[in-house]
């Protein structure tokens, strides 16, 4: 095995560093003697913590700086949370590995109440996600949704300080950082459909680096990849990013894949649902099919309004 070095571009947040260390350990396990180093950096999304993601606008808030490092040969691979990865890549870069998915569900976290249903009317719930907000308010219009940004530790500290009655976070991030005991209850995907790619880690690199592609191959998890391909295809067809109220979740059923999609008005007054099944080999086309079903119900009008609000800020 080559003794060449692989440099991993990563954000500096605790969760991003966990993901990078996970990939580092997997690479070292698969290729003894391989030197793997981290290249930590700060993304635009990490700097702009005083505004909701939906108000900042733009795509690639958490990946652009990492992609620049790849393009300028300051790193060999970049490790991302798949839900943060834009649908399109800069010329010369691509997604060449998707690791096995962690729990994709949203997590209800509270120090006082056992579940979303147990929250009294008027309770304050923290989330930075319009996707979560739309589904929460559709189920519980009596709740107050309050803006919540920052890393996992910061969000938990705000809950502990009494700023919120409960907060909603990705279960995967809590599990990976050792905070599984803070999950009061996992929210069923039937009640809160996840973001596309939620819980999965992806690895981006230069398209021409065949040696890097070969080194990444043992880390690739095909079942997860099929699911994420279907979800990302839906997102792409709806021109979605990580800051819009689009949800999608795919599961494998034998040789088929079942994809559910949702577009919601942030007020929770309108939730559009669609789903379909197709052979796993048609995962990408399935995403387009479900997206088209959502568009036929009026999804474009909801998303146009959301993008308009972001652009007017």
Swiss-Prot record:
Cofactor(s) for this UniProt protein: dipyrromethane
Domain of life, per UniProt, equals Bacteria
Pfam families linked: Porphobil_deam (PF01379), Porphobil_deamC (PF03900)
- InterPro entries assigned: HemC, Porphobilin_deaminase_cofac_BS, Porphobilin_deaminase_N, Porphobilinogen_deaminase_C, Porphobilinogen_deaminase_C_sf
Q: Which Gene3D superfamilies match?
A: Periplasmic binding protein-like II, Porphobilinogen deaminase, C-terminal domain
S-(dipyrrolylmethanemethyl)cysteine PTM positions: 242
Reactions catalysed, semicolon-separated, are: 4 porphobilinogen + H2O = hydroxymethylbilane + 4 NH4(+)
Q: Top-level EC class, please?
A: transferase
Keyword Transferase annotated: yes
The UniProt family comment states: Belongs to the HMBS family.
**Misc note:** The porphobilinogen subunits are added to the dipyrromethane group.
Alphabetized PANTHER family for the sequence = PORPHOBILINOGEN DEAMINASE (PTHR11557:SF0)
Q: How does it assemble?
A: Monomer.
What this protein is reported to do is described as: Tetrapolymerization of the monopyrrole PBG into the hydroxymethylbilane pre-uroporphyrinogen in several discrete steps.
Name this protein carries in UniProt? Porphobilinogen deaminase
Organism in which the protein naturally occurs: Pseudomonas syringae pv. tomato (strain ATCC BAA-871 / DC3000)
